[in-house]
Structure formats: C-alpha cells, structure tokens
C-alpha cells in the first residue's frame, strides 16, 4: 500500500492538469502557430512557463485505485496486476477468465 501522501499528491496533480488543460492547449497552439509574430510566440512561451509544473500531464503517474501501487498498473482497469488477479479469481470482473490452453 502506497503512502496516503503520495496518493493525494497524484490526485492534486490530476486536478491541476484538468484546471489548466484549456489554457495550456491555447498557449501551445500560439507557440506552434508559424503565422503569429515572434514576439507573440515568445510571450506565449513565457506564459506557458509560468504555469505550475504539476499542470503538465506528463508528470502524472498511473496508480492502482485500491493500493496506490505505481508500477504494474493496467490502464484498462486502473488496478495493479496483483489486485486484478485477486479480483478476477473471485469473478468480480465480467468477461475476464484465466487463460488455459
């Protein structure tokens, strides 16, 4: 089980990403638009740098919804591999069966 502080930090990052997503996209569009003047693009780049670091989606980490485990997390379920195994054996994930051949 991950520390609660780490899990809360990830939740805070997710909120920041959602909060600044529209502004971030608008600024990135200005920076990448070649028809804009150099000064406008430079100002947009400076403004983009002023956004909080944690507003960048690449700083987010996928974590297990139950344990908070950062590694071995399946995006489809939002769970770590060991929790998927436990829940699947109990039959709580519809359509998921153990492989046999």
Curated annotation (Swiss-Prot):
Signal peptide: none
NCBIfam families per UniProt: PRK08881.1
The organism of origin for this protein: Burkholderia cenocepacia (strain HI2424)
Lineage of origin: Bacteria, Pseudomonadati, Pseudomonadota, Betaproteobacteria, Burkholderiales
GO cellular component: cytoplasm; small ribosomal subunit
Keywords: Ribonucleoprotein, Ribosomal protein, RNA-binding, rRNA-binding
Summary of subunit composition and partner proteins: Part of the 30S ribosomal subunit. Contacts proteins S3 and S10.
This protein's record includes keyword Protein biosynthesis: no
SUPFAM superfamilies per the UniProt record, alphabetical: Glucocorticoid receptor-like (DNA-binding domain) (SSF57716)
Lineage top rank: taxon: Bacteria
InterPro entries to which the protein is assigned, alphabetical: Ribosomal_uS14, Ribosomal_uS14_bac/plastid
Function: Binds 16S rRNA, required for the assembly of 30S particles and may also be responsible for determining the conformation of the 16S rRNA at the A site.
Recorded family membership: Belongs to the universal ribosomal protein uS14 family.
The protein's name: Small ribosomal subunit protein uS14
One function term, GO molecular function aspect: structural constituent of ribosome
GO biological process: translation
């Amino acid at each position: 089980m991950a520390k609660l502080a780490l899990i809360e930090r990830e939740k805070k990052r997710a909120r920041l990403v959602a909060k600044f997503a529209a502004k971030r996209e608008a600024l990135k569009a200005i920076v990448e638009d070649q028809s804009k003047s150099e000064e406008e693009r430079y100002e947009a780049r400076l403004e983009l740098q002023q956004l909080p670091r944690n507003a960048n989606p690449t700083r987010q980490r996928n974590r297990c919804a139950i344990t908070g485990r950062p590694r071995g997390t399946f995006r489809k379920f939002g769970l770590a591999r060991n929790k998927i195994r436990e829940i699947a054996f109990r039959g709580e994930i519809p359509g998921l069966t153990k492989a046999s051949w």
